Swiss-Prot record:
Lineage: Eukaryota, Viridiplantae, Streptophyta, Embryophyta, Tracheophyta
Positions with a binding annotation for ATP: I677, G678, R679, G680, G681, Q682, G683, N684, V685, K699
Pfam families reported for this sequence: LRR_1, LRR_14, LRR_8, LRRNT_2, Pkinase
InterPro entries named in the record: Kinase-like_dom_sf, Leu-rich_rpt, Leu-rich_rpt_typical-subtyp, LRR_dom_sf, LRR_N_plant-typ, LRR_R13L4/SHOC2-like, Plant_LRR-RLKs, Prot_kinase_dom
Residues modified as Phosphothreonine: T867
Protein name, entry field: Receptor-like protein kinase HAIKU2
Span list, region Disordered: 972-991
Catalysed reactions, as listed in the record: L-seryl-[protein] + ATP = O-phospho-L-seryl-[protein] + ADP + H(+); L-threonyl-[protein] + ATP = O-phospho-L-threonyl-[protein] + ADP + H(+)
Signal peptide (UniProt feature, chain positions): 1-19
Organism annotation: Arabidopsis thaliana
Active site, renumbered: D814
């Protein structure tokens, strides 16, 4: 009996012992996973991961009722798979998959690296797998063994190469598939997924899909979300897509789709979000009139015709409508946007007519009302005067009329108000003073009248005011002088009277001032002479009297028009290039259409005094003759030696953007071959030393056809021949740089132009370029890592400013180390904007077509090879190359990289091996050992920047943020000074 009881007890304890053994193995497997991460900022996650606890007590672990691990959830924990020695290691999928009952594995939204490996296929109980938003490399393994898988998220995971679509064909339970935003090679739509009829969500955007959407898409009848944007999909939208009646979201924007919306598209009545923008679709929108559940509709930049369906006015969920740049006609539905929290409408650049719907801000959340360049008529609705959430209101170039509701002027969040080129009338009321966010006010070409409100000074964010071609009367308020940010004030062609406010001299940012065609009187205020940035001054067609202020002579104006006034006295010699017609009281010996200034009347004097004056005149004449003779001899010698004469000062036009303490002839005389400090595809750069001791850099823009031999004469150096082909490039650089003020962007003082030459005058950078310091002075001096890190961050901030800090983003198009200059304190400055492209402010699609490949070999982004559409991400790629130069010390093109390789391919090829030691070998040997860990972090950022896919590259804002987060290694465990020390301090220690 006792023996029987013993056997029964033994049989009872055996499963318990087995269970304890299994649980112990699970703990060991999880601790092996933990060891992969080493010391991490997410140590809190692993505090409970110790031998003292069971696996079920580990944070992020879920067990079943038997105590077996069924879920690992470590998503969004900032995890990096780097061991205690700092080496990157592959995740131990063999240990993970030894958890035999594991059903859910979530490691998404971390910073995991390395290859995923074939051991993943051993997790054959998995139902849910999320590895998305990481930095993995290499190809994804076949997962045909994961027959129970229902959820697969790999988007933006870093995987590349050929995706194993064939291994998905038998995953019949798969309902969620997200593999977009990865660097796959070009491939057609994966037909293997067309038989996975359980699919409800498919995200394949930005995954290099080419060709057509197959007819077999009709098989996925349970689909609720289909996203195929940012690919190279062509052909028509297949008619079979209308069978996907459960679709709630369809995004196919930024492809090459053509044709019309297929018949039967109306059957997709569950559709809430539909975006087919930036394609070449045609036809009308009639198929959409039955989709009453739409929340967001985007079809901008297509070739759509016909009317906007009136049924849109009854859609009770529609909150965003973007149809700009099509050929749509007819009227907008009156009740459009009245049923829900409508936020956004852009129907600009169509042929729409009728009245503006009045109820789009009924719920009080609307931010954008954009309807410019149509044929709208009628009054602007009163209802929008209460729309306090509006940020941009643009209805210019229509046929609208009537009065603007006074509340519009004072909307507190409005940044851009554009009512130009309509038939509006009435007053600009004092409510404008409440528009604290308003930066641009354009009321030009309307019928507004009344006086200008003095309260406008309350709108102290104003940068641009354009009220031209209206019927405003009365005086120009002195309160304009309080607008410190004002850059452009255009009031021409009105009925303004009185004096020009002296207070305008306080608007020190003014560049453009136009009061032409009014009835302004009295004298031109002397205070205008203090506007050192003023570039254009037009006061023509008024009743101004008195003399031209001497202070205007100091300004470097590209346009000065004082014609048709009542001015008297002589025209200052430095202003003779301006326009002064219609001023009978003006005189000048150098302006042919003005009478000569009188020399003075002779007075009756004694003979002796008369003779004395004659003698004096004779002496002065003799001195002048000798002077001119001497000058002629010197001039002839120089001409014989240099083969050309110096151009006359009056031939030059100077446009200044900052306070100048030099004149143009000081610059021109120094344009000599011996002063050349740089040569480029756009022209030479000269070092110019002024009499004041200041040093400047002058860039001479040349045309491609002109010869660039080593001339000796300053005039020969400036001779460009037929340079009309260069005007666009020169004007692009001036327009860009004149508006830029940033510590990490080179400062432009002025431009100097004449009929056959163009000069740009910059601040001089005494430490040359980053290229010179890295590649041409090795052996003489080595730049330490702290300096390199400071240079990387500073240059990134400069480029971030160009992309994100201006009203209109600027694409540099030639970012390279030789265009990053170093000032006397070793601060980096982005330079050379001859290739810059300013993107139009109101374009949502910010790509542009480049007629020719621009840039420098080794820095050119790969998308130039297959498209003419480039954007800021092309600059990001080039900046990534610069980061690689900083870390490796290598040039972008070197024989060490092998045939047909460059620095990007070289670094990427090593990074795919996921061997930390190999990555460390990429780092410049001159970088101190204690900083190599930080250098490796910067190299990781460089890899992100040089991703083959433009969409996968970060924006410069993100690049700056990542660089700022790199905590210097030397400061982690010591009391040394923080990274905030200037690079100049460090250069004295290292160089």
């Amino acid at each position: 009996m006792l023996r029987l009881l013993f056997i029964v007890r033994l049989l009872f304890l055996m499963p318990l012992a087995s269970s304890r053994s299994n649980h112990s193995e699970e703990v060991e497997n999880l601790l092996k996973l933990k060891s992969t991460f080493g010391e991490t900022k997410s140590d809190d996650v692993f505090k409970t991961w110790t031998h003292r606890n069971s696996a079920c007590e580990f944070a992020g672990i879920v067990c079943n009722s038997d105590g077996n691990v069924v879920e690992i959830n470590l998503g969004s924990r900032s995890l990096i798979n780097r061991d205690d020695d700092g080496r990157f290691t592959d995740l131990p999928f063999d240990s993970i998959c030894d958890l035999k009952l594991l059903e859910k594995l979530v490691l998404g939204n971390n910073s995991l690296r390395g290859q995923i490996g074939t051991n993943l296929g051993k997790c054959n109980r998995l139902r849910y797998l999320d590895l998305g938003i990481n930095n993995f490399s290499g190809e994804f393994p076949a997962i045909d063994s994961l027959q129970l898988l229902e959820f697969l998220s790999l988007n933006a995971s870093g995987i590349s190469g050929i995706f194993p679509w064939s291994s998905l064909k038998d995953l019949k339970r798969l309902s969620f598939l997200s593999v977009g935003d990865n660097r796959f090679g070009s491939h057609p739509f994966p037909r293997e997924i067309l038989n996975l009829t359980a699919l409800q969500w498919v995200y394949l955007s930005n995954s290099s899909i080419t060709g057509k959407i197959p007819e077999g898409i009709k098989n996925l009848v349970r689909l609720q979300n289909l996203e195929l944007s940012d690919n190279q999909i062509s052909g028509e939208i297949p008619k079979e897509i209308v069978q996907l009646k459960n679709l709630r979201q369809l995004e196919i924007y930024s492809n090459d789709l053509t044709g019309k919306l297929p018949l039967g598209f109306r059957n997709l009545t569950n559709l809430r979000n539909f975006d087919a923008s930036n394609n070449s679709l045609e036809g009308d929108l009639s198929e959409l009139r039955f989709l009453k559940n739409l929340v967001s509709l985007g079809m901008f930049e297509n070739r759509l015709t016909g009317e906007i369906p009136k049924e849109f006015g009854d859609f009770k969920s529609l909150a965003a409508l973007s149809l700009y740049r099509n050929q749509l006609t007819g009227k907008l539905p009156r009740r459009l946007g009245s049923w829900t929290a409508f936020k956004y409408i852009d129907v600009s650049e169509n042929f729409l007519e009728g009245q503006i719907p009045p109820y789009m801000c009924k719920k009080g959340v609307m931010t954008h009302l954009l309807m410019l360049q149509n044929r709208f008529t009628g009054q602007f609705p009163e209802s929008y005067a209460k729309c306090k959430t509006l940020i941009r209101l643009r209805v210019s170039n229509n046929s609208l009329s009537g009065m603007i509701p006074s509340g519009i002027w004072g909307l507190p969040n409005l940044q851009f108000l554009d009512l130009a080129s309509n038939y509006f009338e009435g007053n600009l009321t004092g409510d404008i003073g409440n528009a604290k966010s308003l930066g641009s006010l354009d009321l030009s070409n309307n019928r507004f009248s009344g006086s200008l409100p003095f309260q406008i000074s309350g709108a102290n964010s104003l940068v641009s005011v354009n009220l031209r071609m209206n019927k405003f009367s009365g005086i120009v308020p002195e309160s304009f002088g309080k607008l410190k940010e004002l850059s452009s004030l255009i009031l021409d062609q009105n009925n303004l009277s009185g004096a020009i406010p002296k207070s305008l001299g306080l608007c020190t940012s003014l560049v453009d001032l136009n009061f032409a065609g009014n009835s302004l009187s009295e004298e031109i205020p002397e205070s205008l002479g203090s506007l050192k940035l003023l570039n254009s001054l037009n006061l023509s067609g008024n009743k101004l009297s008195g003399m031209i202020p001497v202070g205007l002579s100091a300004l470097k104006l590209s346009l000065l028009d004082l014609s048709n006034n009542q001015l008297t006295g002589s025209v200052p010699e430095s202003l003779v290039s301006g326009s002064f017609e219609g001023n009978s009281g003006l005189c000048s010996s150098k302006i042919r259409y003005l009478r000569p200034c009188p020399l003075g009347k002779p007075h009756s004097q004694g003979k002796r005094k008369h003779l004395s004056k004659v003698d004096m005149c004779f002496i002065v004449a003799a001195i002048l003759a000798l002077f001119f003779l001497f000058s002629y001899v010197i001039f002839k010698i120089r001409r014989d030696k240099l083969n050309k004469t110096v151009q006359k000062k009056n031939d030059w036009q100077v446009s200044s953007f900052r306070l100048l303490n030099f004149n143009e002839m000081e610059i021109i005389d120094e344009i000599k071959s011996e002063n050349i400090i740089g040569r480029g595809g756009q022209g030479n750069v000269y070092k110019v030393s002024l009499r004041s001791g200041e040093t400047l850099a002058v860039k001479h823009i040349w045309c491609p056809e002109s010869s660039h031999e080593s001339f000796r004469s300053s005039t020969a150096m400036l001779s460009d021949g037929n340079n009309r082909s260069n005007n666009g490039e020169f004007e692009a650089e001036v327009a860009t740089l004149s508006n830029i003020k940033h510590i990490n962007v080179v400062k432009l003082f002025c431009s100097i132009t004449c009929e056959d030459s163009k000069l740009l005058v910059y601040e001089y950078m005494p430490n040359g370029s980053l290229w010179e310091q890295l590649h041409e002075r090795r052996g003489e001096q080595e730049i330490g890592w702290r300096v390199r890190q400071a240079l990387a961050l500073g240059a990134a901030k400069g480029l971030e400013y160009l992309h994100h800090g201006l009203d209109r983003p600027v694409i540099h198009r030639d970012v390279k180390s030789s265009n990053i200059l170093l000032d006397e304190e070793w601060r980096p400055r982005i330079a050379d904007f001859g290739l810059a492209k300013i993107i139009q402010a109101d374009s949502v699609q910010r790509d542009f077509s480049a007629p020719l490949v621009k840039g420098t070999l080794g820095y050119i982004a790969p998308e130039y090879a297959y498209t003419t559409k480039v954007n800021e991400k092309s600059d990001v790629y080039s900046f990534g190359v610069v980061l690689m130069e900083l870390v490796t010390g290598k040039k972008p093109l070197e024989t060490d990289f092998g045939e047909n390789n460059d620095i990007v391919m070289w670094v990427w090829s090593v990074s795919k091996e996921t061997n930390r030691e190999m990555m460390m070998k990429l780092i410049d040997t001159s970088i101190e050992d204690e900083y190599k860990e930080d250098a490796l972090k910067v190299l990781t950022i460089a890899l992100l920047c040089t991703d083959k896919s433009p969409q996968a590259r970060p924006f410069m804002k993100s690049v700056v943020s990542m660089l700022e987060k790199i905590e210097p290694s030397y400061n982690k465990n010591s009391g040394e000074a923080s990274y905030g020390e200037s690079a100049n301090d460090e250069i004295t220690k290292v160089v």
